[in-house]
Amino acid sequence: MEQNNSLPPFAQGLASPQGAMTPGLPIFSPMMPYGTGLTPQPVQNSNSLSLLEEQQRQQQQQQAASQQQGGMVGGSGQTPQLYHSTQAVSTTTALPGNTPLYTTPLTPMTPITPATPASESSGIVPQLQNIVSTVNLGCKLDLKTIALRARNAEYNPKRFAAVIMRIREPRTTALIFSSGKMVCTGAKSEEQSRLAARKYARVVQKLGFPAKFLDFKIQNMVGSCDVKFPIRLEGLVLTHQQFSSYEPELFPGLIYRMIKPRIVLLIFVSGKVVLTGAKVRGEIYEAFENIYPILKGFRKTS
């Protein structure tokens, strides 16, 4: 095909088959005048992104990362939320005036001792029946000498490796060991337990031992009371399985292990209750006030 000589020189190159079909050929001519309205364009690779597209892609990634960080409220170490969880990323906002259905996170229940209503009081005061205390005499003891020279003392090492000594006032019993440790049991109050322990230490001193009175401590208190009505122990053990055990073929009472305060209660069908395991008197009273409304709920009607 012959070139059209009537066209300008730059247009002749564009109109030729070589100029139109040759890949990579610039679409402008060095002789192109400035008044044509065409600006020389650099040759670009079609596989590479433009700078504008790259910036847009980075901005989208940053926005997605910020949304994920803002939505991850319940991070590691927190209790999983039930129903209304805030861990899911959401782009919607709550309408003004709306409140969530649950104001606090829902967590699995943990076994706790049922609390007593503040308005309800039993009006019953448990009576202390026994107090166990310990004391350190601070010296080694010859148990045979104590058993031979002291009154109301017995010692049988084949049966028990301690001297068993008793006094009448307060009516208590002491277990005296060769290491100098002593256990006093049988007192009805804290003052009686301390007084009895001092009397036993005085007896040991009079026998020629350098006994002292160190580290006196109450280890256990036992109280009892009567609620004055029969109790359905079968229903109680079914409702409070995690706290109680009841084997009438082995023991006639229900064993209830309270968590706070840490007290063990023996509950009988007649309404008698024994409380043990306390270190101070107040724990006995608190445990009974906690259990009394529960016992009323299982009162026998006939």
Curated annotation (Swiss-Prot):
GO MF terms, alphabetically ordered: DNA binding; RNA polymerase II general transcription initiation factor activity; RNA polymerase III general transcription initiation factor activity
Region span, Disordered: 1-22, 50-81
Record-level GO cellular component terms: nucleus; transcription factor TFIID complex
Spans traversing the lipid bilayer: none
PROSITE patterns associated with the record: TFIID (PS00351)
Major location (coarse): nucleus
Compartment annotation: Nucleus
Xref: CDD domains: TBP_eukaryotes
Keywords, sorted A to Z: Developmental protein, DNA-binding, Gastrulation, Nucleus, Repeat, Transcription, Transcription regulation
Record protein name field: TATA-box-binding protein
Biological classification of the source: Eukaryota, Metazoa, Chordata, Craniata, Vertebrata
